[in-house]
């Protein structure tokens, strides 16, 4: 890790800040809240922002970043911005248009990282979640290798500096890596990862291929109704995190964040509270002992908060495999 900017280098030579701010909001939250939170995060020291077309917040996030550039707080080159192509735009001919729509909303010339959001195609169209008359998602089939070639073209066109994937299992990653004529490897795989789902095998696989693991849901998310079983155990109530928080004089959230950073994982965190956003920057101020890291490893129970259950039955549903 480059400690000056708290960055790691990607396999294409670009750098990614190891702590990012996620801009997905719970349904009950007005999307305009993303603008306020992004400004708070920039003022707190965040330079890495993770978004996606399906979040419907890119116009607000872009406005916040542009206002902070205009007032001299940051420069565009100080910001690392990630967007993602949604499942309805995975046909190769739709990928660039999706990225261009995001750029239009952001009023940016480029994004720093563009990801395939899920390896599962849905019927193309205006609806993000197209359903049939029975309310079932309308699945589609697409050659993900062809989708990847369209991603490579976006990089060549200068619309994104780096390209990667999200929610891919190791077999789906291998399919891209083994693609004949591969021009660019995915720089990262963004997946759910926290002490209850530590992704040890996927992390080892990604490291062996020089692919960075980016973690979302690092504090165990309870907020996304419809996506998360609200009866799931609350990660931050885990007694081990509580006792370590006392030992290091930090919060359980900071222990969970620090755990991932020390494993070489890039961490995304979202908070709706200003004091929490600022507090999360303290993750660089302390270090967990190797003994405590082993204890945290022992919390794994392969438990997903976000199993993308609405996609179950899709031929490319990634979570059937062990990793």
From Swiss-Prot:
Substrate binds at residues 31, 117. Inhibited by high concentrations of substrate. GO terms for cellular component: cytoplasm. The keyword NADP applies. It catalyses: androsterone + NADP(+) = 5alpha-androstan-3,17-dione + NADPH + H(+); androsterone + NAD(+) = 5alpha-androstan-3,17-dione + NADH + H(+). Changing residue 31 to A: No effect on affinity for androstenedione. Slight increase of catalytic activity. Detected in kidney and brain. One of its GO terms (molecular function) is androsterone dehydrogenase [NAD(P)+] activity. The record marks 84 as: Lowers pKa of active site Tyr. InterPro entries: AKR, AKR1C, Aldo/ket_reductase_CS, NADP_OxRdtase_dom, NADP_OxRdtase_dom_sf. Belongs to the aldo/keto reductase family. Optimum pH is 10.0. Its EC number is 1.1.1.-, 1.1.1.209. This is Aldo-keto reductase family 1 member C21. Monomer. It is found in: Cytoplasm. GO terms for biological process: steroid biosynthetic process; steroid metabolic process. Changing residue 24 to Y: Reduces enzyme activity and affinity for substrate. Alters the stereospecificity, so that androstenedione is converted to testosterone. Keywords: Cytoplasm, Lipid metabolism, NADP, Oxidoreductase, Steroid metabolism. It comes from the Eukaryota. The keyword Lipid metabolism applies. The lineage of its organism: Eukaryota, Metazoa, Chordata, Craniata, Vertebrata. The active site is at residue 55. NADP(+) binds at residues 20-24, 50, 166-167, 190, 216-224, 270-280. It is an enzyme of class 1 (oxidoreductase). NADP-dependent 17-alpha-hydroxysteroid dehydrogenase that converts 5-alpha-androstane-3,17-dione into androsterone. Has lower 3-alpha-hydroxysteroid dehydrogenase activity. Has broad substrate specificity and acts on various 17-alpha-hydroxysteroids, 17-ketosteroids, 3-alpha hydroxysteroids and 3-ketosteroids. Reduction of keto groups is strictly stereoselective. Reduction of 17-ketosteroids yields only 17-alpha-hydroxysteroids. Likewise, reduction of 3-ketosteroids yields only 3-alpha-hydroxysteroids.
């Amino acid at each position: 890790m480059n400690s000056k900017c708290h960055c790691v280098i990607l396999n294409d030579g670009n750098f990614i800040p190891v702590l990012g701010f996620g801009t997905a909001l719970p349904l009950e939250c007005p999307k305009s809240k993303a603008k306020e939170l992004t400004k708070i995060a920039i003022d707190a020291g965040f330079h890495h922002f993770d978004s996606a077309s399906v979040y419907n917040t890119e116009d607000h996030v872009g406005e916040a970043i542009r206002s902070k550039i205009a007032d001299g707080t940051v420069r565009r080159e100080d910001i690392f911005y990630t967007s993602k192509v949604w499942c309805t735009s995975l046909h190769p001919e739709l990928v660039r248009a999706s990225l261009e729509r995001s750029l239009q909303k952001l009023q940016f010339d480029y994004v720093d990282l563009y990801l395939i959001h899920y390896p599962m195609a849905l019927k193309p169209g205006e609806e993000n979640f197209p359903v049939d008359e029975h309310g079932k998602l309308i699945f589609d089939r697409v050659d993900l290798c062809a989708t990847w070639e369209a991603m490579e073209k976006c990089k060549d066109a200068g619309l994104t500096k780096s390209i990667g994937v999200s929610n891919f299992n190791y077999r789906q990653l291998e399919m891209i890596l083994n693609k004949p004529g591969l021009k660019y490897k995915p720089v990262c795989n963004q997946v759910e990862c926290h002490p209850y789902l530590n992704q040890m095998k996927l992390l080892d696989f990604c490291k062996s291929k020089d692919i960075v693991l980016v973690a979302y849901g690092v504090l165990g998310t309870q907020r996304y109704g419809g996506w998360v079983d609200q009866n799931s155990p609350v990660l931050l109530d885990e007694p081990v995190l509580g006792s370590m928080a006392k030992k290091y004089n930090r919060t359980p959230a900071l222990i969970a964040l620090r755990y991932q950073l020390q494993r070489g994982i890039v961490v995304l965190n979202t908070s709706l509270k200003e004091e929490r956003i600022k507090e999360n920057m303290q993750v660089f101020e302390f270090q967990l002992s190797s003994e405590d890291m082993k204890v945290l490893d022992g919390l794994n129970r392969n438990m997903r908060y976000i199993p993308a259950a609405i996609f179950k039955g899709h031929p490319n549903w990634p979570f059937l495999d062990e990793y």
